[in-house]
Curated annotation (Swiss-Prot):
Gene name of the encoded protein: bioW
GO MF assignments: 6-carboxyhexanoate-CoA ligase activity; ATP binding; magnesium ion binding
Protein name listed in UniProt: 6-carboxyhexanoate--CoA ligase
Quaternary structure and interacting proteins, as annotated: Homodimer.
Matches recorded under InterPro entries: BioW (IPR005499)
Species annotation: Bacillus amyloliquefaciens
Length: 290
């Protein structure tokens, strides 16, 4: 059954430093809805200090949800709380953007999960290198990527690294590639966490959702990631062959540098890959629910 839906796109920017609230509202009409289901909305938050990200501000926090109308208030409240409770500091700029999803939402299975103990960053990084090799990345290409990690850490998003050319190929500079428009419904995540004896915390949920979407792209071999959160030292390697491999310690506490590299096989259309990562809506859901 189809019906005429009024799709709303609006953006709320709050610059706390100057106590300024700016609201930009647009509306458009779209015929029908996906499979007769309730409209779904992408809710995205970014927070920074001293200026917006594109003006050189320090990144503080980010997050997003895919949610129906009835869950919008809870989603926005949760993102506000996340933005103001990050260990990187208190933001003076925050933007929350909502937009309707008017295209099919792809469903992706969670990755198999494993955990590796490491009591020093050096041991953790050594584990990461071995896992990347198991995923199919040549050792000399792993080392070439590591040589540029300090530069890649400046990017707000991820870096696409071509393992044939041995170089970064996204062309996004400090912006990087932001994996977006994905979520893992809470009830499904909770059941998955219980089954796999994993903590039911939002950090694992969000990281695994990103990893699952990244690994779903046929041209991406593996992801290497650790957070820029100074209080969070765990990182991971994710790959189709290996699943989601968490590593206990990949940096020292207090270190605000992070890393996110997507290793590609050299055959991808870069713009198509970036479009999938940033624009394709995705739900993570266990196999029995697909």
């Amino acid at each position: 059954m189809t019906y005429s839906e009024k799709a709303l796109i609006f953006c709320i920017s709050v610059n706390l430093k100057f106590i300024l609230v700016h609201i930009n509202f647009q509306s458009k009409r779209k015929e029908g809805n996906i499979c007769g289901k309730k409209p779904t909305y992408s809710v995205r938050m970014r927070a920074s200090r001293n200026a917006p990200h594109e003006q050189g501000g320090k990144h503080i926090s980010g997050g997003e949800r895919l949610i129906t109308y009835s869950g919008l208030q809870e989603a926005v409240d949760g993102l506000l709380h996340k933005g103001f409770s990050h260990s990187r500091g208190i933001p003076d700029f925050m933007q929350i953007q909502l937009e309707s999803i008017n295209e099919p939402i792809e469903t992706i299975r969670p990755l198999p999960v494993a955990f590796h103990q490491s009591d020093t960053p050096e041991k953790g990084q050594a584990i990461a290198r071995k896992l990347l090799q198991k995923a199919g990345i040549p050792p000399h290409m792993i080392e070439k990527a590591y040589e540029n990690i300090a530069e890649y850490a400046e990017a707000r998003g991820a870096v696409l690294f071509d393992i044939r050319a041995g170089e970064r190929i996204d062309g996004r500079g400090n912006r990087g590639v932001r994996v977006s428009r994905m979520d893992w419904p809470s009830h499904d995540f909770q059941k998955w966490a219980f089954t796999h004896n994993m903590p039911e915390n939002s950090r694992i949920k969000e990281a695994h959702a990103i990893a699952a979407k990244v690994c779903a792209h046929p041209g991406i071999i593996a992801e290497l990631c650790w957070s820029d959160d100074p209080d969070y030292i765990t990182g991971y390697v994710a790959a189709k062959k290996l699943g989601y491999q968490r590593i206990a310690k990949m940096k020292n506490a207090g270190d605000e540098s992070g890393c996110r590299i997507f290793f590609t096989d050299g055959s991808i259309d870069t713009e198509s890959c970036i479009h999938f990562l940033e624009k394709q809506p995705v739900f993570i859901q266990r196999e029995e629910n697909i």
